[in-house]
Design a protein with these regions (language model features):
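Conserved alpha-helix/loop element of class I SAM-dependent methyltransferases that forms part
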Residues: 2-18
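Conserved class I S-adenosyl-L-methionine
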Residues: 18-27
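Short SAM/SAH-binding signature in class I
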Residues: 86-93
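Conserved SAM-binding motif I beta-strand of class I
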Residues: 43-48
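A short, conserved alpha-helix within the catalytic core of class I
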Residues: 97-104
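Conserved SAM/SAH-binding beta-strand->alpha-helix loop
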Residues: 50-52
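Glycine-rich SAM-binding Motif I of class I
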Residues: 29, 33
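S-adenosyl-L-methionine
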Residues: 55-84
Length: 104
């Protein structure tokens, strides 16, 4: 698996074990994969609005044999989860206006 960029390593450092995370705009799924490899008790939902990006994430998740640890969902922002499913939101690699729109 490809190594995380320094930026994503910093993002990952704010996540704790036992977290219930949604990785919004997961792209290739690298951050989600990194988190489940780093933490044994974490739950991760990797989501993306772009079907091709999510397909790439699914491929990478399968390559790492992590299908049972990372759930994938196609959809926009927080629309793909219920409030009680998560306690940590990760939005990395998007512009400020996009992030504000997701959080509204």
């Amino acid at each position: 698996m490809n190594k995380l960029s320094k930026r994503l390593e910093v993002v990952a450092s704010f996540v704790n074990d036992n977290s219930k995370v949604i990785d919004i705009g997961c792209d290739h799924g690298l951050l989600s994969i990194y988190l489940v490899n780093k933490y044994k008790n974490i739950k991760v939902i990797a989501s993306d609005v772009n079907e091709n990006a999510l397909s790439s994430a699914i491929t990478n998740i399968k390559k790492e044999k992590l299908e049972n640890r990372i759930e994938t969902r196609l959809g926009s922002g927080l629309d793909v989860v219920k409030a009680d499913e998560i306690d940590t939101i990760v939005i990395a690699g998007m512009g400020a206006n996009t992030i504000v729109g997701i959080l509204k």
